[in-house]
């Protein structure tokens, strides 16, 4: 008797609505150059978002402050985990410059978790909001803050 393994050698194709084209286009290249040149991070790149090409071609991005290394190890997240670098206090100024270069009227800012900092990074959120408002007064700012480990004081710093 001969045993034959039976399995489908064809990989099931993802549905069209789930596939995203490789990031290309003039706006994508320009935003990539801005982010790289100003040493900024986006959740788009750090979390390996498949829609980065689409969003960046529409000149939208979610900035990620406080570095690109998270102090938590959430299994669902693609952001790098480990011991983060020191806080870069020039990051808010560079982010505001990037937002101006992108012509933003609405900026979205989030961050990695920084459980290594007493305020969880609240001070840098406040500095970033201030820098954007100072550089682009008409720009609205949305911040997606971490939980600050439940610290009301940290939240008040941001507000």
Task: Provide a role label for each language-model segment.
Residues 58-159:
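Conserved Radical SAM active-site core
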Residues 1-72:
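Flexible, acidic/Gly-rich N-terminal and inter-domain linker regions that tether
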